[in-house]
């Protein structure tokens, strides 16, 4: 069963700075994760229900949870995790979804 990692980001204090860093630094690091089957990311266009705090969403698909775990434990995963902690530690929620 495929495993999908979602990263959902709250609105940052500096949206333009966030987008610049995400697109030029973080997305390339995430794209280098071993075993990554598909990767997409985009700004949240509209909040239908809730407080409207969500700003950006990333979706990373892996063959299964083992592949996801291996990717996160890899050197590339460590680089991406360190970068995430630097620029979005207090902004991000991470979720894993099993997807057939």
Enumerate the language-model features and the residues they cover.
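Macromolecular interaction modules
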Residues: 1-100
